[in-house]
Regions:
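Hot-dog-fold acyl-thioester-processing enzymes
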Residues: 2-57, 116-129
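Extracellular/lumenal ectodomain signal focusing on beta-strand-rich modules
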Residues: 58-60, 110
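HotDog/MaoC-like acyl-thioester-processing domains
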Residues: 3, 7-13, 68-69, 80-129
Length: 129
């Protein structure tokens, strides 16, 4: 496997999963990762939409490697498409294996989510250009 490095830009979100985030096998539960991906995606979508957004679709979600307790997990989110009321966000997830001395970086996941801009009462709204 090639030696990966983290992307040069700042991550949108960075977290360390804990023991209570594990599944029955002892690695990190996929649902936990999905929720963190959604948080990272919504962060950049909210900034670009200049207000609240709601997740309306997961176009793609791949699990490429397991996560473990103590990994330092970095989420890199970017807007890839802007429509009238919705926008697509791509999220790449990497882990620094905290328990290994060599600082191995592993690609964990890639996802594309769609968010719709909403008004305070929860109705869709136009995204400012």
């Amino acid at each position: 496997m090639p030696n990966l490095t983290l992307p040069k830009e700042q991550p949108t979100l960075r977290v360390i999963p804990m023991v209570y985030d594990t599944n029955a096998r002892g690695d990190i539960f996929g649902g936990w990762l999905m929720s963190q991906i959604d948080i990272a995606g919504a962060t950049v979508a909210t900034i670009r939409a200049k207000g609240p957004v709601a997740t309306i679709n997961v176009n793609k979600l791949t699990f490429e490697a397991p996560l473990y307790v103590g990994d330092v997990v970095s989420f890199y989110a970017r807007v890839t498409r802007i429509g009238t009321k919705s926008l697509n966000v791509e999220i790449d997830v990497f882990a620094e294996r905290n328990r290994q001395l060599d600082g191995e970086v592993v690609k964990i996941s890639n996802a594309e989510l769609v968010y719709v801009a909403i008004s305070e009462p929860g109705k869709s709204r136009v995204i400012p250009q």
